[in-house]
């Protein structure tokens, strides 16, 4: 019974990974749109996009860490 609950909890925690993938896609699609509108700001916008990517990926890594904790620690 407990093992099944752990698997369900870990599966629910990994749903955040799909959200992070959508978020990263939004970051880079916005970068492409912004550079297409104003190519002279491409270098500055790329820095902002990398920052957004890193923050979004950090959330995904935290969710993955929680899934592993649910599976192997509790």
From Swiss-Prot:
The keyword Signal does not apply. It is a multi-pass membrane protein. Keywords: ATP-binding, CF(0), Hydrogen ion transport, Ion transport, Lipid-binding, Membrane, Mitochondrion, Nucleotide-binding, Transmembrane, Transmembrane helix, Transport. One of its GO terms (cellular component) is mitochondrial membrane. The chain crosses the membrane at residues 8-28, 45-72. The keyword Mitochondrion applies. Pfam families: ATP-synt_C. It is found in: Mitochondrion membrane. The record marks 57 as: Reversibly protonated during proton transport. InterPro entries: ATP_synth_F0_csu, ATP_synth_F0_csu_DDCD_BS, ATP_synth_F0_csu_sf, ATPase_proteolipid_c-like_dom, F/V-ATP_Csub_sf. HAMAP family: ATP_synth_c_bact (MF_01396). F-type ATPases have 2 components, CF(1) - the catalytic core - and CF(0) - the membrane proton channel. CF(1) has five subunits: alpha(3), beta(3), gamma(1), delta(1), epsilon(1). CF(0) has three main subunits: a, b and c. Belongs to the ATPase C chain family. This protein is one of the chains of the nonenzymatic membrane component (F0) of mitochondrial ATPase. This is ATP synthase subunit 9, mitochondrial. It comes from Marchantia polymorpha (Common liverwort).
């Amino acid at each position: 019974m407990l093992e099944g609950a752990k698997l369900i909890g870990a599966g629910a925690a990994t749903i955040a990974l799909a959200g992070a993938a959508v978020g990263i896609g939004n970051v880079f699609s916005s970068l492409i749109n912004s550079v297409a509108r104003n190519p002279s700001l491409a270098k500055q916008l790329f820095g902002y996009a990398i920052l957004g990517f890193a923050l979004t990926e950090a959330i995904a890594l935290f969710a993955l860490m929680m899934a592993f904790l649910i599976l192997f620690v509790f």
